[in-house]
Amino acid sequence: VSNAEDYMRFALMLWNEGEYNGQRIVSPDSIALMRQPHIQTGVLSNQVDGMGFGLGVGVVMDAEKTILLDRESDFFWSGFYGTNFFVSPQSGLVAVIMSQNQPPPASPWPGSFGVFIAPAFGFLGI
C-alpha cells in the first residue's frame, strides 16, 4: 500500500540504478540482478513472448516479439487491478499509473498501460 508519489520515487530509484535524490538506496549490482531474467522461457504457462521475469520485475528480453514495450532492458510490474510502473533506461522514460480496475474480461481496460503510452511515445513504431 502506497501512494503515487512514493511509487514514482521507487521507480525513479530503479531507473537511476539504485540512487534517488543523491542518496544510494540499493547497489547498482542489486539493480542489475533484478533486471536480469531468472525464469527460463517456457516454464510458465502464461509467459508473454519477448518478456522474462527478473527479481520483482518483468523485463523485455526481445523487443521484436513483444507489443507492450519496445526496448530491450525495459522493465515493469503491474498489479492485478491495474496499478503499473515501467522504466525504460534507454529512453529515460519512467511512468506510474495508479488505478483500480478489474482485469479483462470484467473491464475493457487491457491491464497494461504500456498499450496506451507506448504508441504515444513512438515505442511501437506506429
PLM region spans:
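Catalytic loop of the DD-peptidase/beta-lactamase superfamily, centered on the K-T-G motif
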Residues: 1-126
